[in-house]
């Protein structure tokens, strides 16, 4: 039976600890739920290190561990906490190789969550890391993608920001690109918006809108393939990049790169430019299939 993404992550962490490759650090790791069931039931003597509830200190501790020869997995239970966790990772771990020839490889498991989690904790925040040199960013939404991300990290010497989303943890399916000879739009979905694509295809079929879908695993470095650019050039109304982060962030940069390479208009659709509240009436959620198709219809109909 195929494993879920949740089970895949749990197996990776367990093997990482049991094989002596490194420790796992974070807050409330061994609390009820074991971070959404993505951690094995291991404890400090096994390498599961509980950090104090001081978010700024956590990033510094794992940076120090990496400099000392550990290859830490750092679990950040809500991506919004990266405003505190990122300081030492960005300003030391990501820069030390270029400046001093030392390395600090850290596997940052940064977990996004949407719906009623308020103005700080919710949504994805990979744009915080995106503009800084010396690190890589991936957003795996499938089991094979996560295995690839981990194995790539283990063969590298830089910090990796792994942008996860809790709503993907039950996923067992791999996500395949759909590229037609001609289309109205080419969609470049990132993070949890990728799991809206199956529903979006059905909605587009009912509205006679033809789309290409090119799933995005790598956020940084973003290197567009020739096939993607050809797909954009063959799309009547251009493309759109969707994400669970604000539009004034990495998706704006990615859309610009795609637009320059293809000479086509590439739009962005992410979080609205406002603060999320706890109540559903004031929440700020990533674009779902309905919101995406409404956006496409506005463009198509002029």
Question: Each predicted region: which residue ranges?
Answer:
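Thiamine diphosphate
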Residues: 1-159, 163, 165-302, ...
């Amino acid at each position: 039976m195929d494993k879920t993404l949740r089970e895949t992550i749990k197996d990776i962490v367990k093997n990482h600890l049991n094989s002596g490759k490194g420790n796992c650090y974070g807050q409330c790791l061994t609390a009820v739920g074991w971070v959404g069931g993505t951690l094995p039931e291991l404890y400090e003597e096994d390498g599961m290190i509980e950090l104090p509830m001081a978010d700024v200190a956590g990033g510094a501790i794992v940076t120090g561990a990496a400099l000392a020869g550990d290859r830490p997995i750092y679990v950040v239970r809500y991506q919004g906490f990266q405003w505190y966790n990122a300081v030492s990772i960005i300003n030391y771990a990501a820069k030390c190789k270029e400046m001093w020839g030392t390395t600090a490889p850290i596997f940052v498991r940064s977990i996004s969550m949407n719906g009623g989690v308020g103005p700080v904790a919710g949504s994805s925040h990979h744009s915080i890391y995106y503009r800084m040199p010396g690190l890589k960013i991936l957003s795996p939404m499938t089991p094979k993608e996560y295995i690839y991300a981990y194995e790539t990290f283990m063969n590298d010497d830089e910090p990796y920001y792994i942008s996860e989303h809790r709503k993907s943890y039950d996923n067992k399916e791999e996500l395949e690109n759909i590229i037609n000879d001609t289309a109205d739009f080419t969609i470049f979905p990132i993070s949890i918006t990728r799991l809206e694509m199956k529903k979006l295809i059905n909605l587009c079929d009912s509205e006679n809108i033809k789309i290409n879908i090119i799933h995005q695993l790598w956020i940084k470095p973003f290197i567009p393939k020739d096939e993607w650019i050809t797909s954009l050039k063959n799309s009547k109304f251009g493309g759109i990049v969707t994400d669970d982060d604000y539009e004034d962030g990495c998706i704006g940069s990615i859309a610009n790169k795609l637009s320059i390479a293809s000479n086509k208009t590439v739009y962005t659709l992410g979080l609205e430019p406002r603060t999320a509240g706890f109540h559903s009436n004031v929440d700020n959620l990533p674009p779902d299939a309905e919101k995406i198709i409404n956006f496409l219809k506005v463009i198509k109909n002029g």
